[in-house]
Structure formats: structure tokens, C-alpha cells
Amino acid sequence: MMLTKHEADQWFAEHSLPDIKIFPNKDIEQHLRYALSQVNTHDLFLEFGVRDRKTFNIIKEYSNVVHGFDSWTGMPWPWQLTRLVEPAKTGPHLAAKTIPKSDDTQIFWSGLFEDTLPKFLKEYNQPISFLHIDSNYYKSATQVLTALNDYITNDTVIVIGQCHAFEQADLKKWGNVWNHGLLACKNWGRNIKFFSRNHFLQVAGKIT
């Protein structure tokens, strides 16, 4: 089910712009801000995987309202290199210390994506300007892309975290499991073109 390093490298190259912008470090904020600067519409801004709101607060600087999705209880499955198997056992992996409160500028959806997405779509069925998926699991990333498919347009900027180990050292440390974001995009079936990436796991692209 997982992509090998060679398969992931090849698929990513085939779906990247020739002049893809590469940030030569592992700084998530710098790359995230660049991706946000490429947004040219003012519709929905969404983040899946909020946790401590570090990236969420950055996204808020670019939109009047941002929707955040998370369980805030930790990983729904054990965080391990065999995570794509996704056993039923649960645990408080990476749980947030506090659950944030919603207001006029931030709306939080607490629970598993499969439970909160249907509720969200009943209230908000409009195009998506910016989508940040930082879900840690292939299953979760696939749920997001599938549920929001009709609202992802050519103007939607998509940022996916934990997407691909570009360095052999990272691959040795984490294994092919870090290709889960890339695999979700591949199996999604839409023609995505990546326009930027940082040096570790985070990529950004648009549908063409």
C-alpha cells in the first residue's frame, strides 16, 4: 500500500512544476507563509490537525475566519511506522493540553474528521481557498480530500504536512510511512501540481 522511495520521488517529480520553489530548510512557518501568499480568493480557510494552534495562528493572519478540525484527544491510532494498518487500539498520542474555544475569527470542530466533516458541510458548502492537511494518517488525509472534493477548485491552495522524506537520512529515520500524504493525493485521482516544498515533509500545490 505504501510507496517506495523511488515511486514517491518519481510521482512527486511528475506532479511538480518545473520551477518548483524549494525552501532549503525544515522550517514549516516559512514555507506555510509562502503557500498562503499564493492564495488569491477569499473563501474557506481550513486546517485539519490543529493541536496547539501553532500553524493555525499563522493561517489566521491571512483570513478573517479559519476553521480548525481536531479531536484534541491525541492520535486515534498508535503513532508508529505501521500506522497505515491502523489497528483499532487508541491512545493519547500528541494530545493537546487544552481545547480552544470558537469565536468570530476561529471556528473549531472537535472530533474525528469522519464525524465532523458531514456536520461542517451542512453549514458551509462553498469553495475552499486554503486547505492545510496535517493529519498524520493516510486514512485521515483521504477522508478530507474525498469529503471536500466538490469544493476544491483550481484556486484552492493545498498544503500537506508529513508528506514525503526527501532526504535519505529522514527516510532511514521515519521509513516510507511518511509518504502517506503523497499516497493520499495519488489515490485521490485529481491532477495536482506542486509549486513548493520545504526540506522536510511539507508540500504545497494546486489542482490543474
Report residues per predicted region.
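Conserved SAM-binding loop and adjacent beta-strand
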Residues: 17-30
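S-adenosylmethionine/decaboxylated-SAM
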Residues: 5-15, 38-208
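N-terminal pre-catalytic "stem/leader" segment of glycosyltransferase-like enzymes
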Residues: 1-2
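Conserved alpha-helix/loop element of class I SAM-dependent methyltransferases that forms part
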Residues: 27-43
